[in-house]
A protein has these predicted regions:
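Conserved NTP-donor binding/palm subdomain of two-metal-ion nucleotidyltransferases/polymerases, i.e.
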Residues: 1-60, 66-295
Length: 295
């Protein structure tokens, strides 16, 4: 169910049924992390209690949230047990929040070092979710998952970046909860600094919400991309340093993104053509901005 910004494709799909392999992957990963003494929370999909999603929803991968300090160790642990890197953190979304790995029998896992829109910091978000985590038996093994209320909050926060299925998920949660439970969930969203994502996903009042985050999540909800999204991120940046980092991350071509778009392996000519187009678009935007400022 997670976002995947990669064009790499396995040479052959796993022989197992999709649901079976995803459930087995949850159990296997939980076993590996438990044996290594590393905390990890399984998010969304089959790692939720009945009723969180509409009926008959299927999942295509494992979403695993770990403490940022453990992210590198988790990647290495999975690599040592048959998972191969597909996209690094820097090659994923604009938040650089997840790395994707592939296992020939168990399929994809997205390792999250943060959950965009949730928490004052990645560390605070993980600690808040872990502080009241529960266990859900998946493929015969207890798997660490957020509490029932946090399961729903994670789905709603994610919906701010997924306007299609996410909208259905939010509507389902809202309609399936009593009014007082929905109000309590809203309060929890604000307590965990998820007000911007909550507003964008639910359309409810945005009182007291960080306007920069609100602008960014609204752009993602509207499926902005390319130069349009760059403009929004530039306007949302609070400091010169943030804008410098934005430019530095925007200029290099994201190979997995490009491969996904092309549907084939990327060549040097593809990279050069994409790089030239990207630099040209940024130069044109900078020129237009300078001309407007001088008027």
């Amino acid at each position: 169910m997670g976002e995947r910004a990669t064009g790499q494709r396995p040479s052959a799909p796993p022989s197992l049924d999709l649901e079976v392999r995803v459930r087995l992957a949850h159990a296997r990963i939980a076993h590996l992390l438990d044996r290594a003494g590393i905390r990890g929370l399984h998010l969304k999909g089959y790692a939720t209690e009945p009723g969180v999603y509409p009926e008959h929803r299927r999942s295509s991968d494992v979403d695993l949230l770990v403490h940022p300090a453990d992210a590198a160790a988790v990647i290495e642990l999975l690599r040592s047990h048959g998972w191969e890197p597909v996209a690094a953190f820097s090659e994923g979304s604009i938040f650089q929040h997840a790395a994707t790995l592939w296992h020939d029998q168990l399929g994809y896992v997205d390792v999250h070092r943060l959950f965009p829109g949730l928490g004052a910091s990645p560390e605070a978000a993980f600690d808040a979710l872990w502080s009241e985590h529960a266990h859900l038996v998946i493929a015969g093994r207890p798997v660490p998952v957020p509490s029932p209320r946090h399961q729903r909050l994670v789905v709603i926060v994610h919906a701010a970046r997924d306007p299609f299925r996410g909208g259905l998920d939010v509507r389902h949660i809202r309609e399936s909860l009593p009014a007082e439970s929905w109000a309590a969930l809203r309060e929890e969203a604000h307590r965990l600094h998820a007000g911007a994502a909550w507003h964008v996903a639910t359309g409810e009042a945005a009182d007291g919400v960080d306007t920069r985050q609100l602008t960014l999540f609204a752009a993602l909800h509207e499926s902005q991309s390319g130069l349009e999204l760059f403009r929004t991120r530039w306007q949302s940046a609070a400091t010169v340093r943030e804008r410098a980092v934005l430019v530095a991350r925007t200029i290099p071509v994201n190979r997995p993104h490009l491969q996904m778009r092309l549907g084939r392996p990327v060549t040097r000519a593809d990279l050069w053509r994409e790089q030239r187009a990207r630099l040209g678009a940024l130069a044109g935007w900078a020129w237009t901005k300078a001309v407007r400022r001088d008027r």
